[in-house]
Design a protein with these regions (language model features):
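Non-DNA-binding regulatory cores of transcription-related proteins
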Residues: 1-56
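Pyridoxal 5′-phosphate
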Residues: 57-448
Length: 448
């Protein structure tokens, strides 16, 4: 496929190469064909000038993918890039200063989730923490059993790690979700076994935002002698968490989800729980996680989580008001949609399925209008497959590709809501006017 610029607009033209070897389309060509179909729906009204002179302010509605570093947090980090740049493992003065800063951040993180400082282990982020929790428990406790339980709509960091463990000979059972996006403690009770050593269920879903019954699930796991892990990457800083009261044995988090820096996270490991270490090397993190300590990142994470927790109720009330107004307006103004997920969800999350059109086309058009949203998990947004989460809650496969996630943050405004709804309404109308599926459905209604 070739994108050709013309005086009056843009168009896709097919390449002149002979068919792929064997007569079948190669993977690259299949990708381009999908892009071609989606983009052709919007390029008819787009000119090259639109792209070259687009200077719109971005309206960022993808806070579940990442957040900007808070200015105050950044100011706390900066000294540790230069004048306080010592290695926290060094014994000289600059090293000791760095160690003090790391210890302070460790306490800030621990206090935020009701843990003890010696239960916090810094990592590179959520994916490493998930890998360490799952592989570490599986390998350390396999003599007690080789059965693991998770849910069918976890983050890829959990699902793909479980696949690796299955390849090693572990058995994995998957909890289902109901149409509202919640797993059931009753189902967990029905599938847990004497040889189950770990249950892992995410705290809040990264796509539809539903908050799971963590305390109930942990009670079931413990009643049968299993550990309980939760991927709380989306929840930390947005939901009040008390690992002791909720019975959590291991918890993963990542700073960039609560206005901290990227590349830093941690794994909470309850005292007495001993997963096998994931990364071999030096003796950092009390000899449990090798690698030079990312002091600026750790410092930023500590201050970010402290600020997020201290202002959580106020921020959530503000963000939920934006989200609720957005949802109300979309439901009133755009027909043939599905609002995904139940009421107990993250304050900023709104997830819709728009029937008869592709999510990629919606996102492309919104992007041109300066609106940043997402078709689902940022860690799997390059996949051409429909979202596993959306399929798991019962959205038909033919509709699932039309799903969009909007996630609001504390810098958004009601003006952002109004502008986004206006642009979304125009976008959906125009794309449906060119959709054969929409035309077919309209014709059927007319015949009836």
């Amino acid at each position: 496929m070739v994108l050709r610029a013309l005086e009056d607009g843009l168009e896709f033209i097919d390449c002149i190469n002979t068919p792929c070897e064997g007569g079948e389309e190669c993977k690259a060509r299949r990708v381009w064909n999908k892009i071609y179909k989606s983009m052709n729906l919007v390029l008819d009204s787009l000119t090259l000038d639109d792209l070259l002179h687009d200077q719109k302010r971005y309206i960022y509605l993808d806070h579940s993918a990442t957040t900007a570093v808070d200015e105050e947090v950044l100011s706390k980090m900066l000294p540790y890039f230069y004048e306080k740049a010592g290695n926290a493992s060094s014994q000289h003065g600059m090293g000791r200063d760095a160690e003090v800063a790391v210890d302070r951040a460790r306490k800030q993180v621990a206090d935020a989730i009701g843990a003890k400082s010696n239960e916090i282990y810094f990592t590179s982020g959520g994916s490493e923490s998930d890998n360490w929790a799952l592989k570490g428990i599986a390998h350390a406790y396999k003599s007690k059993g080789k059965h693991l339980i998770t849910s069918e709509f976890e983050h890829p960091a959990v699902l793909n790690t479980m696949k690796q463990l299955e390849a090693e000979g572990f058995e994995v059972s998957y909890l289902h979700t109901n149409p509202q996006g919640y797993v059931s403690a009753d189902e967990l009770e029905s599938i847990i076994r004497p040889d189950t050593i770990l249950v892992s269920v995410m705290y809040a879903n990264n796509e539809i935002g539903t908050i799971q019954p963590i305390e109930e699930l942990a009670k079931v796991a413990h009643a049968h002698g299993a550990f309980f892990h939760t991927d709380a990457v989306q929840a930390v800083g947005n939901v009040h968490i008390d690992v002791k009261a909720q019975g959590i044995d291991l918890l993963s988090m990542s700073a960039h989800k609560f206005y901290g820096p990227k590349g830093i996270g941690c794994l909470y490991i309850k005292s007495g729980v001993r997963p096998e270490r994931l990364i071999a090397g030096g003796e950092q993190e009390r000899n449990q996680r090798a690698g030079t300590t990312n002091t600026p990142g750790v410092v930023g994470m500590g201050f970010a989580i402290e600020k997020a927790v201290n202002n959580m109720d106020e921020n959530n009330a503000y963000i939920a008001a934006l989200r609720d107004e957005f949802v109300k307006e979309v439901k009133e103004r755009i027909p043939d949609i599905r609002y995904n997920g139940g009421e107990k969800r993250l304050a900023g999350n709104a997830h819709f399925t728009f029937r008869y059109i592709e999510g990629e086309s919606i996102l492309f058009t919104l992007d041109l209008a300066g609106i940043c949203a997402s078709s689902g998990s940022a860690c799997s947004s390059g996949s051409l497959e429909a979202s596993k989460t959306v399929l798991a809650i019962g959205v038909p496969a033919e509709e699932a590709h039309g799903s969009i996630r909007f996630t609001f943050g504390r810098e958004n405004t009601m003006d952002d809501v109004k502008y986004t709804v206006d642009e979304l309404e125009k976008t959906v109308k125009r794309l449906r006017s060119m959709s054969p599926l929409f035309a077919e459905s309209t014709a059927k209604i007319t015949m009836i």
